[in-house]
A protein has these predicted regions:
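Active-site-proximal loop and beta-strand segments within enzyme catalytic domains
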Residues: 5-6, 60-169, 176, 259-261
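Short, gly/Ser/Thr-rich active-site loops of penicillin-recognizing serine hydrolases
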Residues: 276, 297-300, 308, 313-324, ...
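Active-site-proximal alpha-helical segments within enzyme catalytic domains
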Residues: 124, 169-177, 275, 279-301, ...
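Active-site Gly/Thr loop motif
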Residues: 222-285, 314-370, 406-410, 414-415
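Active-site helix/loop module of the DD-peptidase/beta-lactamase fold
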Residues: 68, 76-77, 91-133, 151-152, ...
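A short acidic/small-residue loop/turn micro-motif
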Residues: 57-59, 381-384
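Alpha-helical scaffold elements that line and support the substrate/ligand-binding pocket
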Residues: 43, 47-48, 73-95, 121, ...
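Short, conserved catalytic-motif segment at the N-terminal edge
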Residues: 13-74, 96-99, 152
């Protein structure tokens, strides 16, 4: 069972700008309800930090406090942060979203992938959510070995016809694509560190350096997969049955190596030091919000062009076979490394320009060009929603409905 502890009322830090008090109230309410152990939330608007909150325990078993510089692993919220590296590469003319992946990575054309475009790959349409060759952790440490394995993989559906969440594999494909187009041949983690984190002054890592002290890391309090069966009111039933069925695409998408499919394993340093750009990004929550805030306000410090930013904000190009996600087993919409708003998951303003990615357990971060907002929330007590964790929705609703009056954050009840 997921750990539950009582957090004292005085275990909070940070501040908000005038007018953003409802977000602070929502943050405290999450703790008062007993839903949190430790968490942080930050918001940038028009380039300025307007919300920066943290509280509770970074480790619920030892009662060590979550502090201003605490870092937390954000699971698939990593995907959106990692995809900023692809946006930088696109702006520099290193890749074209509508070019074939094999143009940059010839070996990728093996096994029927020759016509897959970068857009299809980044939008979870390439049919590559699984890896058939059994992997070990040591394989993940070798970028050359992973490139060979990824190039050999055959799609499990006709690319472009369907889509399905590439829960783990997306980041590895992005990583090899960056290695191929970057003149310096850097890994995605290093490219991100040099070209995104450094210019913005971020403490966020895709591949945690060994010199980051353990005392700065939040401990994830997760659950074992069978526990999902007790939360079918929160987690979609079809997803749960697929995740627990070794024959299903859903199981295979998160099960190679199996260590990556268990939330608590992301407390292991040997896993965090690897580059898993779809899953193991670790950093300060305010820095995630800062990065998205940069995208929401023009991307000047990263040299991101208006053409790239328009591509990210524009409506997704859906697969020809509809929006049913083969892996998640419900409708979803992806575009260029991000999730876009859709009736079952409405975020950002009613203009629909926002883009971001949620992570296992409840984290979520996004950019909203319409309001100039970069938003991020992460926690260490795992919840059971694929998205719209009630704790995160409470914060986002306080921001968009109470402060900005910019649109409902609740799903369309008719869907």
């Amino acid at each position: 069972m997921v750990l539950k502890v009582r957090v004292p009322e005085d275990m909070f830090g940070g501040d908000v700008e005038e007018g953003f008090g409802p977000v602070a109230d929502a943050f405290r309410a999450n703790f008062a309800s007993g839903a949190e152990i430790g968490a942080a939330c930050a918001v940038y608007q028009d380039g300025a930090k307007v919300v920066d909150l943290w509280g509770g325990y970074r480790d619920g078993r030892t009662s060590r406090p979550w502090e201003e510089d605490t870092m937390v692993t954000v699971f698939s919220t990593t995907k959106g942060v990692a995809s900023i590296a692809l946006a930088v590469a696109h702006s520099r003319g290193l890749l074209d979203y509508d070019e074939r992946v094999a143009t940059y990575w010839p070996e990728f054309a093996q096994s029927g992938k020759g016509e897959v475009t970068v857009r299809q790959l980044l939008s979870h349409q390439a049919g590559l959510p699984v890896i058939d060759i059994p992997l070990k952790l040591e394989d993940l440490a070798s970028l050359d070995r992973m490139a060979e394995v990824l190039a050999l993989q055959a799609p499990v559906w006709d690319p472009g016809a369907r889509h399905g969440y590439h829960g783990i594999t997306l980041g590895w494909y992005e990583g090899e694509l960056i290695r191929r187009v970057d003149p310096a041949g850097r890994s995605l983690g290093q490219f991100f560190a040099d070209e995104v984190a450094a210019p913005l002054g971020l403490e966020f890592h895709i591949g945690l350096p060994d010199d980051v002290p353990a005392e700065r890391l939040a401990t994830i309090h997760g659950y074992k997969p069978p526990e999902m069966l007790f939360h079918l009111g929160e987690m979609p039933r079809k997803f749960v049955t697929g995740f627990l069925n070794p024959r299903s695409i859903t199981y295979k998408a998160f099960g190679n190596p199996r260590v990556l499919g268990l939330i608590n394993n992301y407390n292991r340093r040997e896993l965090l030091r690897l580059e898993i750009p779809a899953a193991n990004g670790t950093g300060r929550v305010r820095d995630i919000a800062s990065a998205y805030g940069e995208l929401a306000t023009g991307g000047r410090r990263l040299g991101i062009t208006s053409v790239t930013l328009d591509a990210l904000a524009n409506s997704a190009v859906p697969p020809s076979g509809g929006l049913m996600d083969v892996v998640l087993r419900l409708e979803s919409i992806f575009s260029l490394g991000y999730v876009k708003p859709f009736p079952s998951f409405r975020f950002g303003s009613s203009a629909g320009l926002a883009y971001g990615t949620p992570g296992a357990g409840g984290s979520f971060a996004f950019a909203d060009p319409d309001t100039g907002v970069g938003f991020a929330y992460a926690m260490n007590r795992s919840g059971f929603h694929l998205w719209d964790d009630p704790r995160e929705v409470r914060l986002r609703s306080a921001l968009y409905e109470s402060v900005l009056d910019a649109g409902s954050q609740r799903p369309d009840a008719s869907r």
